[in-house]
Amino acid sequence: MEESLLSIIVALDAKSQYDALKIVEQLDPTLCRVKVGKELFTHEGPSVVKKLQEENFEVFLDLKFHDIPNTTAQAVCAAADLGVWMVNVHASGGRKMMETCVERLKAGNYQTQLIAVTVLTSMGREDLKDIGLDIEPVEQVKRLAKLTKESGLDGVVCSAQEAKILRELIGQDFSLVTPGIRPEGSNADDQKRIVTPKQAMLDGSTHLVIGRPITKAENPTEMLKSILASIA
């Protein structure tokens, strides 16, 4: 598959494998990838990943691992054993944790991409202050993105509003995976830092994570095609 044609990652915000498969029945694996998060994976385990792969979807396993280096690396390799396209960790776990994950993936000759979460898109300045970080979200994102790049990972999860800044800071050979994407007229839901698909791509995002606007649409396929047309 051509990477440029797979910029959209559909978040499968489903509680069961049945519901997830009903969603992907209405999607085309040549037009998007899918994301399996904590709720779905906790309910269904690895079997849901395998089922999605049987339907020819590449899977981003969004479990945001965050633990001591060895434990995190073992979890990342376990995800890679499932054959997922991408998996993530929390950059706040630190350099040693991230470097250990990269080393283990290379040692195992895995093709799975590893990215890091910088600042959760639901968090604003006051939220960071609550956990002892008296800093603007964008400054923390820059700090953690730079650390992620230095640690050898493939990219970061970041708000589209930070994408342009990160491109200048880090360069082109680095994935910027962006949640908080809402087509024109959509509800912001619980994402604080949101941007439209077209603007996100213009700002330098490489992949757009879109959930409810597609999965809750009356016709998910038509919504997906509409979004693709808007960023073409």
UniProtKB/Swiss-Prot annotation:
Keywords: Decarboxylase, Lyase, Pyrimidine biosynthesis. GO terms for cellular component: cytosol. GO terms for biological process: 'de novo' pyrimidine nucleobase biosynthetic process; 'de novo' UMP biosynthetic process. It is an enzyme of class 4 (lyase). Substrate binds at residues 13, 35, 62-71, 121, 182, 191, 211-212. It catalyses: orotidine 5'-phosphate + H(+) = UMP + CO2. Its EC number is 4.1.1.23. It holds the Pfam family OMPdecase. InterPro entries: Aldolase_TIM, OMPdecase, OMPdecase_AS, OMPdecase_bac, OMPdeCOase_dom, RibuloseP-bd_barrel. It comes from the Bacteria. One of its GO terms (molecular function) is orotidine-5'-phosphate decarboxylase activity. Pathway: Pyrimidine metabolism; UMP biosynthesis via de novo pathway; UMP from orotate: step 2/2. The active site is at K64 (proton donor). NCBIfam families: PRK00230.1, pyrF. Catalyzes the decarboxylation of orotidine 5'-monophosphate (OMP) to uridine 5'-monophosphate (UMP). Belongs to the OMP decarboxylase family. Type 1 subfamily. Homodimer. This is Orotidine 5'-phosphate decarboxylase. It comes from Acinetobacter baumannii (strain ATCC 17978 / DSM 105126 / CIP 53.77 / LMG 1025 / NCDC KC755 / 5377). The gene is pyrF.
